[in-house]
Amino acid sequence: MTISKEGYVNNPARPAFDVTVSNGSVSSGNTIVFNEADLNNGTHYSTSNGKFTAPITGTYLFYFGALKDATTAVARIKLLKNDGSYIHNRELRLDNRPTISYGENAATVIICSLSSGNTVEVRVTEGTIYGSSDGYTYFGGYLLS
């Protein structure tokens, strides 16, 4: 943020995105490619490969949620950095509940430091995640500082 000599505040848009999966299911071992972008400031999230690329070094907040496919007993998803390491080793675990006949959903938030050029993606590590136009499976994030 800068202030001009005329007193105007110039605050460039911070990197931010909010994306969903509009159709299809994603099975274990695959990156979830969120193909619908409701917000993509700076176009740092790719709807073709499912990765967010940090444009600058800083602290980022990420959130993601998913609906488990009803045909799978357990589903797990994790946030990965640079195609390999899990961030904070946190995961979403979605289990069947005996009282419902449809998939279960859950969400989480993660804050982490990234360097410029680092990538972040959401990967299914067990089971199958459901995607639909209802936006049950989503991912988003933004630069905090």
Model-derived regions: residue spans:
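Extracellular jelly-roll beta-sandwich "head" domains, especially the C-terminal globular C1q domain
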Residues: K5-S145
